[in-house]
Amino acid sequence: MEIHEKFEQTDFGKTLAGRVRYDRYKPKDVSNERWIELLGADVNNLTHLTLTYGLAQDFIRTAQTLQPDLLTSEDEQLLQVAALIHDWAESIVGDISFGDKTANDEREEQAAFEANLASFYKGDLTLINKARTEIVFDHTGKNKLGQVFNAIERVGYLRTALRAGDHIIRGDAMDCDDGLHWLVADVLSQQPKALIAYAETLQPVGQYLANQHDKISLMFEIIARSDDVFDNYPPDQREAKRLQFGESYQAWQQYRLA
């Protein structure tokens, strides 16, 4: 955590601390403080890093029990470093929603990270550089640690969507209800299919999906009854987003029956 403690004291860390994630779903008249109160640490750009660090530790602990040959001790160390550093460059390029981020956006973020690394962290960069190249900016999709970290990030998105779903079910955040529905719809459209695929080789992912099975199923059912949620997208995207959600829902139903 020393890496994070040093970074959060920089101007870059302070910039992240003042920003929220999932901003596109937040009603404009709702404060950042209220948004964080509802959805927790994942919503603040800086504390998202330590939350992801915690998710990485959870994955590592579960893998040590269920899949002890999956990760070496060095793998475990690099995953935790990657969690703490992966969004540092967003202090410069900003946060882009998962479904909107393009390959060009990824390249710009990587370039900003590399150009400013010495300012982000003044210390030994050996582990940071290794995590950066092998995990954070691994674009091959074939590297084991890159896949594990991608799965951890996707679990983070789903976790926050399920927290939003809790507020929908309880009806205790009506000032944000439409935005929470949209957040849940967007995440359910994008994350479950990939996580189902990861569950075939990464047992901690399979356990997470099993533990959250009923809640995920309920949120799919709620969004399936809320067709107007897709009106939040630009008109030229709405039909594609409906289809994407439908395909994801179908994949989840098939997974439930497997």
Segments (PLM) and residue ranges:
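Alpha-helical, largely C-terminal catalytic domains
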Residues: 1-258
